[in-house]
Each structure stands twice: as structure tokens, then as C-alpha cells.
Regions:
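Amphipathic alpha-helical interaction modules
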Residues: 22-88
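Amphipathic alpha-helical coiled-coil segments with heptad-repeat character
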Residues: 3-6, 10, 14-17, 42-45, ...
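Amphipathic alpha-helical binding modules
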Residues: 86-132
Length: 132
């Protein structure tokens, strides 16, 4: 059964990676419309890009774990560490945004970091749901 979990995760990561590629493709197709549109569209595009980049990094990290650890027990141990780190990072980013005092100088970076973390967190939650 452990092998089937790893196999399921690998297949799910391939599907998620395809979703990331589609998301990036959609962003590229809409680039001209966004750049010529209102600032709110640029902001939305930037947050979407950060979110997708976070998803891609989480997928890449999980694929690396699958390649590095052949034993399911070792993989799950390191996966749980990764998932915990990403969850904690997401909580930290939300807290950081809520406590932002110097909005003009740090707002863009804080929002980008938050959406990057949210993208990673989405992947972890999705993988956790199929492992249950």
C-alpha cells in the first residue's frame, strides 16, 4: 500500500504541474490585456504569478523528496517536515501582513510572499487530502 501512496502522489504531482503550466500559459496570453488595463489588473496578475510560483516550488520540492527517498517511511517523514514548514511559513506570512506598519515600502513584497506561500500551502493541502 505504501508504494501505491507514492505512486498516487507522483501522478497527482504530474497533474498539478500540468495545472501550473496551464496557469502560466493563461497569464502569458492575458499579458497584453493586463498591461494595457487598469492597475488593479496588474496587481491581480502579480499575485496570481506569485501563487503559481509557490505551487511550482512545492511541487518541485515534493518531487525531489520522491527521488531522494525510496523508502516510504523516510519519504513520509521528510514530507511531513516539508508540509509543516510550509504551513508555518504561511501562518507567518499572514501574521506579517496583519502587522505591516510601513505599508508603502514593504507592501508589494509582503503580498508577493503571502501569495507564494498560499500557492505552496494549496499543494500541501491537496496532497494531504489524497493521502487520507
Amino acid at each position: 500500500m505504501s508504494e501505491s501512496i507514492r505512486y498516487t502522489i507522483q501522478n497527482e504531482l504530474l497533474d498539478l504541474y500540468d495545472d501550473v503550466k496551464v496557469g502560466l500559459s493563461d497569464l502569458n496570453e492575458q499579458k497584453a490585456l493586463t498591461i494595457n488595463g487598469p492597475a488593479s489588473k496588474l496587481f491581480k496578475r502579480a499575485t496570481r504569478m506569485s501563487y503559481i510560483q509557490g505551487q511550482k516550488q512545492a511541487i518541485d520540492e515534493m518531487n525531489q523528496l520522491l527521488e531522494t527517498y525510496d523508502e516510504d517511511e523516510q519519504f513520509l517523514e521528510h514530507y511531513n517536515q516539508l508540509a509543516s514548514r510550509i504551513r508555518n511559513d504561511n501562518i507567518e506570512k499572514v501574521f506579517s501582513l496583519s502587522n505591516l506598519t510601513d505599508i508603502p515600502s514593504h507592501f508589494e513584497e509582503t503580498i508577493a510572499d503571502l501569495y507564494f506561500s498560499k500557492g505552496q500551502n494549496f499543494i500541501i493541502k491537496h496532497i494531504n487530502s489524497i493521502m487520507e
